[in-house]
Curated annotation (Swiss-Prot):
Belongs to the ClpA/ClpB family. NCBIfam families: chaperone_ClpB. This is Chaperone protein ClpB. It comes from Bordetella bronchiseptica (strain ATCC BAA-588 / NCTC 13252 / RB50) (Alcaligenes bronchisepticus). The Clp repeat (R) domain probably functions as a substrate-discriminating domain, recruiting aggregated proteins to the ClpB hexamer and/or stabilizing bound proteins. The NBD2 domain is responsible for oligomerization, whereas the NBD1 domain stabilizes the hexamer probably in an ATP-dependent manner. The movement of the coiled-coil domain is essential for ClpB ability to rescue proteins from an aggregated state, probably by pulling apart large aggregated proteins, which are bound between the coiled-coils motifs of adjacent ClpB subunits in the functional hexamer.
Amino acid sequence: MRFDKLTTKFQQALADAQSLAARNDHPYIEPVHVLAALLGDPDSGAASLLARAGVAVNRVQPAIDSALKGLPQVQGEDNVQVGRELQSVLVRTDKEAARRGDTYIASELFLLALADDKGDAGRILREAGLQKKALEAAIDAVRGGENVSGAEGESNREALSKYTLDLTERARQGKLDPVIGRDDEIRRTIQILQRRTKNNPVLIGEPGVGKTAIVEGLAQRIVNDEVPETLRGKRVLSLDLAALLAGAKFRGEFEERLKAVLKELAQDDGQNIVFIDELHTMVGAGKAEGAMDAGNMLKPALARGELHCIGATTLDEYRKYIEKDAALERRFQKVLVGEPDVESTIAILRGLQERYELHHGVEITDPAIVAAAELSHRYITDRFLPDKAIDLIDEAGARIRMEIDSKPEVMDRLDRRIIQLKIEREAVKKETDDASMRRLAVIEEELEKLQREYNDYEEIWKAEKAAVQGTQAIKEEIDRVRAEMAELQRKGQFDKLAELQYGKLPELEARLKAADSAEREAGESDSGKPRLLRTQVGAEEIAEVVSRATGIPVAKMMQGERDKLLRMEDFLHKRVVGQDEAVRLVSDAIRRSRAGLADPSRPYGSFLFLGPTGVGKTELTRALADFLFDSEEHMIRIDMSEFMEKHSVARLIGAPPGYVGYEEGGYLTEAVRRKPYSVILLDEVEKAHPDVFNVLLQVLDDGRLTDGQGRTVDFRNTVIVMTSNLGSQHIQSMAGKPYEVIKEVVWDELKHTFRPEFLNRIDEVVVFHGLEAQHIESIARIQLKRLGERLEKQEMRLDVSDAALAEIARSGFDPVFGARPLKRAIQQQIENPVAKLILEGVFGPRDVVPVDWQDGKFVFTRTLQ
């Protein structure tokens, strides 16, 4: 026996047999041990070979187990030896290998030798239906006329079943999603596949446009015989490159596996079409020093037409990997897959609707489908249809399913309250005074009431949940019946098809209708309480998912938000004093956008705020961010004085390729990509270099900007505010004149500084008035209120008299510098003295800090609160 000439698989089987004998205290390794080891290894292929030869494999394993129990056992024997019976079988195996001309002895010849064996192993196989001729035929079929010439000869067998996934089989089983539309691309793919040479289409398109779906659509058409005669009966196999590479430890193993795949494909005489998803991964796959990569190994087969291949890759990766290898590129024919429009996406979603309803066990309404297509197109700009729309449907369905599976919020709230009261009851029980006794009676009464309410809700919830689960089970049964009907139609078994179509299916549909109505009835209790479980995905659920993902308020406005928008001016006036026109113009722009009337291809609003320093230009922008997002954090503030040089424009949008900082992205573009719904403040805009305005033209007109890395950043959900001091001398000199007259003069000044195409794209040029004495007093109140809030954190209260307020306003008023001197006046005249008094211990927690103006100075007299 040539033990050095056993294949790796056979050597492994003998080693496993030795371990099995040692574990069971058997002194000798018998053929039955080796048979058990071969059948126990899922990678050996012995079980599939015996099944192909007509052996009932499920009967073999129990018989082996009982045979092993019948073998003699010797306790404490470590040296396990090869039994005489096994030696005899191995010799016959060696002879059979020599007769067949094999260099290495494969494990299937051991099974062939067992066919003549008189021992347990041979008897077990014969009783399970083994016939020598059938096994020989099965071995010849598996080998495909090849001899075993290497130690890995067995590993590379049936390479297609190991390293590919049969898409046509999955289509036959109904496991692929239906493919709606894409007829032109599928037709073009079929057309290329029918060519004599270079019959290899490559599907090129952006991620998520449906390249893989086109191949799945082709597999479904082949299964349904909706293809030309030349493609009928062919299989579409998806190549699993990861499986090809996994475990290829030694040099040449990967190449051997790929050669085995190519050889099987060549033997099948064009009956298989290989689909390579992410085709660019083939370039460089398995590459080692001096070795060929997968791409180069495929070239000869592709050129000769032996390999029918469909590739799929994105535009960027095609350009980066495939186009660089001209020899590989010319062997493929390009099929460009574009992004479908919103109407096509809606059709695709309607086709997938049933699958997602079945998976999540919820109902997806048509408004939800339309909303998913439209909202994803409008608000999710960095991804592509239909993928991003499908994601919205999927996530909304998952959210509703999660609500169904978990306890409803109203019950959860009651449950927590009941637990809280029970804890309180146990604490009160320990007390003996009258007040505690009365409290205990109140707790008992409330507990009883809450428990009754909870039990009512629980009953409704269980009824609703049972109804939902019943509906789901019927839907799954209908889906299974439809898949069975499709299979029967393909096989032409019309008698059984008619049985299902006119018997079982109508019965199931009637049951579903009854279950649906029962579910609706379960939703309304006797007391008229609303449904506890939502089972429908509507447009609002889709809008909620979009809002959560992007931070953009897409969901339908609640009444509270409507009222808030209508009173927006009041909110802004709390922080900005004396600028009525500016506040009104900004409020109108926000209301237009939230009511859905604004141009969807431009930012919500673009404003140029003009006016002297310290009149509230920046403060209004802060107030706007606070109003929209309840936080000033959503304001992206860019000081344009930092962009005075020509080269600093690159900082806004990111450095071009080849420059330092290319990977970091742009200051403005990255901020908007992270917060697509925000207020952008470009402060002191006239100080920026003129080239900066060229960048802003695209933002103001189309609501988009391309950064240094070629990505399009969406500005359509932003409010852009630019501030400038231009024309401030005219505004101050014309104080008291009508707003329109002042604006006209300032507009003439603007024309000398900014280009017409820039000014023309701004929605509103807002002129801020210089502040007057009465405005300063209101601003002083606002600033002192903020100081009061800071003191309240230290448990102190600020009390400013009218005389003190008037003096602060008087000393802080400067018509040239606006409200900023007021801040300095408060700091010097109030904050500094109060800080000293707090440190000296004059004022402490629970004190009132009074501020008064007496005898030409500020007085702080301590009183208890």
